[in-house]
Amino acid sequence: MLSICSRVARIVPAVAALLVLACAALLVLAGCGAPALAPDGTSLAALGRARSDVPKLGGCSIFPSDNPWNTDISESSVDPNSANYLAAMNADTTNLHPDFGHDKHYGIPVTLAPKKTPFVPMKFFSYPDQSDPGPYPFPKNTQIEGGKNATGDRHALVVGEVNCHLYETYDTHYVGPGWRAANGAVFDLSSDKLRPDCWTSADAAGLPITPALVKYDEVQNGEIDHAMRFTVATTQAAYQHPATHYASSITNPNEPPMGMRVRLKASFDTSGFTGESLVILTALKKYGMFLADNGSDWYISGATATRWNDNDLDQLKTVSASNFEVIQLGQLYTDC
């Protein structure tokens, strides 16, 4: 916008000052001069290049365009400690693994709560002091990770269409008329606001889960336009924003911190890949993925869908994690 105004100003010098003032006002109204900030005031836009559009789910935009989940990091600098981080994550001996597939109990489901969904009580039994209080708009048929009788993480992810807020819980159980969970977090999808420092969420890193999931419809449309989520077995007792929490007592500086972002190298040859795997690998070069939890090494999270083609996804299992690089880290937080 400023470049256009500058050209006109050179043509008509008499109105140059007025044009500069007008363009500045337009930029303020457009929000161009107000980058997303972390709790400490650090600009999150520095993590990558913002864009003009954002992913959508259930009629809701998934965070603003300058949010870290939506930024292009294909040209971001590589961290000088990248090789050591990769070694700690067993990159040379581990391949990617899609933690989702066609089985209805595989992956993490997302529930869309229509605008008329009632808000019901939500009680927390493990981390109430780090949870956002209820009520939550959880329908009685809210989908649970692994199914209603699952014994695993039992994540519940709900997009409330009435206010475009994201509600995520861990170890979730229906008790009628409401729910109980180990902990819960609420994210305003129109805001860049992070959770308080040292607070967890339904994810160990204090991050939202839903924006990170590989979703069937977006893959079928040919493009994933956001960062993804992955796990490794051991992490450092540290995090960087947008993460707000760590889940480790390890102080080795070569161990990966929560919120670390990795990217598939631009030089990695994807010409032999097809279908769903090709779409995922292409996005990993552009948006990468955040380290979000302790778990199996290099497992990528996806949404539940019986339409996934497992044979297609299995191509990812041939990709060595050594083909990734760690993006330049920002400030690390270690005092929780």
Placement of each model-derived feature along the sequence:
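N-terminal secretory signal peptides that target proteins for export/translocation
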Residues: 1-14
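Short, surface-exposed polybasic-aromatic patches that bind anionic ligands, especially phosphate groups
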Residues: 41-336
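Intrinsically disordered, low-complexity sequence elements enriched in Ser/Thr/Gly/Pro
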Residues: 5-8, 37, 47-49
